[in-house]
Amino acid sequence: MARRSKGRFIDGIVLLDKATGMSSNFALQRVKRFFNANKAGHTGALDPLATGMLPVCLGEATKFSQHLLDSDKRYLVTAKLGQRTDTSDSDGEVVQTRPLEFTEAQLMSALEHFRGDTQQVPSMYSALKYQGQPLYKYAREGIEVPREARPITVFELNFISLEGDELTLDIHCSKGTYIRTIIDDLGEMLGCGAHVIMLRRTQVAHYPYDKMVTLEQLEALVAKAQEEQLDSSSLLDSLLLPMDTAVADFPEVNVPDASAAYLMQGQAVRVSGLVADKLVRITLGTERRFVGIGKMNEDGLLAPKRLVVIHDQAKAS
C-alpha cells in the first residue's frame, strides 16, 4: 500500500524574510511545519550569514521553483575592507590583513569592472558540486579543486556608502552570482582584501520587498490561532501568493473549456497565436484558472510541460 503524504494540500508561495544564523533548509522546514504543508521547497539557498527574501513554494507551487531559481536577484551587501577570510565572509578565519591605500577614484574604477557581463570563478565555499560532492566539503578539508569560470551579469552595482573600512553596495545580478566572490575579488583589486560582514537579499524576480514575513510573525499567527481556538490556516493562508506568480513573466495562453479535459490528461491541444519553443503560462476557460506551463510543439499544438494537480484543499492525514 502506498504511503499517504503527511500534511495538507496547500498551494502557494511564502516570501520568507530569513533571519541570520540559520540555514535555508532549517527555515524551509519551519515554514512547512507552520503551514502543515504536504510539500515544500525553497528557490535558492541563502548562506546562514545572509538575511532576506527566500521564496518558499508549497504544494504544487514546487513544480515551478526552478523558474525562480533562474531569476534575477538583488542584494544589499556590506564588506569589511582590509581583511581577507578563507570563506570570503565573517564566518571564516582571517587569512590576511592589509592597509587601505586606495583612492576614491580607484574604488569607483574597480566597481566598474564588475558591471555588465563577466566571468566569475565560484568560491570553494559554495554548494556547487565537483565529482558529486559540494565544494565546501573539499574546502573544509583544505583541498582546492579546479573550478571553471561561469558567465554572470551584474545589471546594476550601486555605491551606497564607505564609512571607515566598511563599504556598502546594492547589487542586481543574474542567477548563480556569488556576492562573496565579488567582494573578495574587489578587495584584491584594491590591494587590501575584503570580506562580507552583512548580506541581505532584497528581491527575487518581481516579488515585492514589503510582502516578506518572518518566522516570528508566522509563529505569532499560529499562537494567536491556538489562543482563539481557530484553525491556523485561517490566519496563515492569506499570506500565500498564487503559485502562478512564479511564472508571471511567461505569456498567458488561455485554453477554451472544450479542450480543457484533453489538456489536463497530458494531450497537446490546438491553440492559435503561439510562438514555437517558448514556454507559456496556461489558463483554462473564462475563469482563466492557472493549470501549468507548456510549449508549442512541431505540429503547432500546445503541449503541456508541467500541470498542477487540483486539490480540494482538504487535509491529508
UniProtKB/Swiss-Prot annotation:
<comment type="function">
    <text>Responsible for synthesis of pseudouridine from uracil-55 in the psi GC loop of transfer RNAs.</text>
</comment>
<protein>
    <recommendedName>
        <fullName>tRNA pseudouridine synthase B</fullName>
        <ecNumber>5.4.99.25</ecNumber>
    </recommendedName>
</protein>
<dbReference type="InterPro" id="IPR020103">
    <property type="entry name" value="PsdUridine_synth_cat_dom_sf"/>
</dbReference>
<keyword id="KW-0413">Isomerase</keyword>
<feature type="active site" description="Nucleophile">
    <location>
        <position position="47"/>
    </location>
</feature>
<dbReference type="Pfam" id="PF01509">
    <property type="entry name" value="TruB_N"/>
</dbReference>
<dbReference type="GO" id="GO:0003723">
    <property type="term" value="F:RNA binding"/>
</dbReference>
<dbReference type="GO" id="GO:0031119">
    <property type="term" value="P:tRNA pseudouridine synthesis"/>
</dbReference>
<dbReference type="InterPro" id="IPR015240">
    <property type="entry name" value="tRNA_sdUridine_synth_fam1_C"/>
</dbReference>
<keyword id="KW-0819">tRNA processing</keyword>
<dbReference type="GO" id="GO:1990481">
    <property type="term" value="P:mRNA pseudouridine synthesis"/>
</dbReference>
<comment type="similarity">
    <text>Belongs to the pseudouridine synthase TruB family. Type 1 subfamily.</text>
</comment>
<dbReference type="InterPro" id="IPR036974">
    <property type="entry name" value="PUA_sf"/>
</dbReference>
<dbReference type="InterPro" id="IPR014780">
    <property type="entry name" value="tRNA_psdUridine_synth_TruB"/>
</dbReference>
<dbReference type="InterPro" id="IPR002501">
    <property type="entry name" value="PsdUridine_synth_N"/>
</dbReference>
<dbReference type="Pfam" id="PF16198">
    <property type="entry name" value="TruB_C_2"/>
</dbReference>
<dbReference type="Pfam" id="PF09157">
    <property type="entry name" value="TruB-C_2"/>
</dbReference>
<dbReference type="GO" id="GO:0160148">
    <property type="term" value="F:tRNA pseudouridine(55) synthase activity"/>
</dbReference>
<dbReference type="InterPro" id="IPR032819">
    <property type="entry name" value="TruB_C"/>
</dbReference>
<dbReference type="InterPro" id="IPR015947">
    <property type="entry name" value="PUA-like_sf"/>
</dbReference>
